[in-house]
Amino acid sequence: MKQARPLTIINAQLVTPGGVTAGALRCADGLILALGPDVAAETGDEVVNARGKLLAPGLVDLGVFAVDKPAFHFGGITRAALMPDQSPPLDLPSRVGFIAKSGKPDLWVHPLAAATRGLEGRELAEIALMQDAGARGIATGRRWIADSGVMLRLLQYAAMLDLVVVTHAEDGGLTGEAAATSGEIATRLGLPAAPAEAEALAIARDIALAELAGARLHIRQVTTQRGFDLVRAAKARGLAVTCGITPAHFLLSDLATADFRTFTRLSPPLRAEADRQAALAAIADGTVDVIASGHDPRGPEDKRLPFADAAPGMAGAETLLAMVLGLVRDEVIPTERAFDLTARNPARLLGVPAGELAPGLEADLALIDADAPWIIDRRKMEATADNTPFDRQGAQGRVLGLWKGGLALGV
């Protein structure tokens, strides 16, 4: 499907990397033509009155574990990078090609190729062929690659192909089957735990190897003070190192696990309050490049178990936008930075022409009421599962309209 006629959205607050300005946006043939205070509708255009609400780029969610269109559309997500942890894993060109074609036209799914066969961390997968099939990056999946030789070869190969390597940063030798972070809370609850330093050790090694290989490294979730310090130092040295985080890790600490509620069983596990505060500081100072939903819907068969036995993961697509807009209201970041974190930066890492309101880019647009109040209710969620750690929490910020390539989507 293609856009039938030009679309002009008037009376909008346009969110661009330079700030938020009043104006209009016009698009045709799936691309943004012009935006600004002097843009006006032309004869034959479809016209939408934004009535002073935010017009922002559709979100680009980097690192989801399931394709969940209703949840994505509710949350303003028009593109999602799918992790290779599927059944079967995305370790063959045919599987990557199938995923790259799925979802269109109302959602573009960008597959992340499995770094190793079966995601077992031993033998490199057919990365170049998977890139040809549509892979936009390489990912280690839910686990860290323990073998440094394999990891170095992966990074060298990725550097030749100019593909970003997306890593999970926990030293598996330390984490084992841990369900919590070592500390007072885990001890009191009697949960199997691993030291927070497992993250810093993994990050330090991967940064050293990425520097050696000259590769682009994206650490999908950084959640500790030491981890942020390592990324900050790597950036200061000019390395192509970026990092992300999910809302749970900057809004919740390990205190949220005190009632054994398995919806707070995450990977990495929730950290101490000091690390949560460090996450907010890292978002504010630019150390964090991406905020993603970490969307990983888990049904009752995975969550209605003892805490240590439950599968980690949260359904995050529907709450991502509201949680990030909360950072704006709390004056941690300005509005334009919120959409750099959730749209522009992930689009650049993936190399896709989206994530920003600019002429010539895809008309992936979200009309947003940043102040609209609502209650997160897992019983009413659009996701394929309701495992949100934010159930019954108040939120602000809802999508009023969504367009993918200029085509209106139902929200």
Locations of the language-model features?
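Divalent metal-coordination and catalytic microenvironments
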Residues: 12, 25, 30, 52, ...
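N-terminal metal-binding scaffold of metallo-dependent hydrolase/deaminase domains
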Residues: 1-42, 407
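C-terminal cap of metal-dependent C-N hydrolases
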Residues: 12, 362-411
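Metal-cofactor-binding active-site regions of metalloenzymes
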Residues: 75-95, 102-123
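Histidine/acidic residue-rich metal-binding segments in metalloenzymes
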Residues: 122-291
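Alpha-helix-loop-beta-strand connector modules within alpha/beta enzyme cores
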Residues: 92-109, 156-167, 319-323
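His/Asp/Glu-enriched, well-ordered alpha-helical/loop segment
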Residues: 188-216, 285, 290-291, 296-370
